[in-house]
Amino acid sequence: LAIERMLGHASGMIGLPLRLLAREVYDRVVAAKGEAAAALITGEEKIAPENARYFICTVEAMPLDRAVEFLAVDEIQVARDLDRGHVFTDRLLHARGFGETMLLGSDTMRPMVRKLLPDAEIVRRERMSTLAYAGARKITKLPKRSAVVAFSAEEVYAIAELLRRHRGGAAVVMGALSPRTRNAQVKLYQDGEVDFLVATDAIGMGLNMDV
């Protein structure tokens, strides 16, 4: 919704929690508006055409000195995080579009948003899918198009190697990878060249994967 709202304005900026998600959104904006209209700004990548009108950024990299008609910040509940929370809190307090501002996140942020912005319109949207416990499974017996979430780089690589030995292939997605490598790994999985994805829990922050 935020992307469509942004593209309905003459200029816009969106702050996202993950570099990989920023790249995904950037590709969508380029497809809709062309390369000259879109900028990608993260801690690792900067693609900034001179006359760009839409800025897709990680939250930390948002150029707040630039006035835009529409501004959105995604996953504002990260304001509670001990490491990154101060940045999200600053954006929640100060980042605004001069025509429209959209703050997206967990319903747990409703009381805080209501206190800070008493006139804000709060819209609750139901999740498009449900999460269900399927029981214990051996990793080597998982069905194709499965994603495995691990919580350290060592576990990610170990599980990916296990899947490669027994099932033929797995893509790896972690924040520690270079942008080019991350994007290539996502493409491998999305294009069906491998049937398994092994990632850190960061994929739960809005990445759209065909799992």
Task: Report each predicted region and the residues it spans.
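Helicase motor core with emphasis on the C-terminal RecA-like subdomain
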Residues: 1-73, 77-211
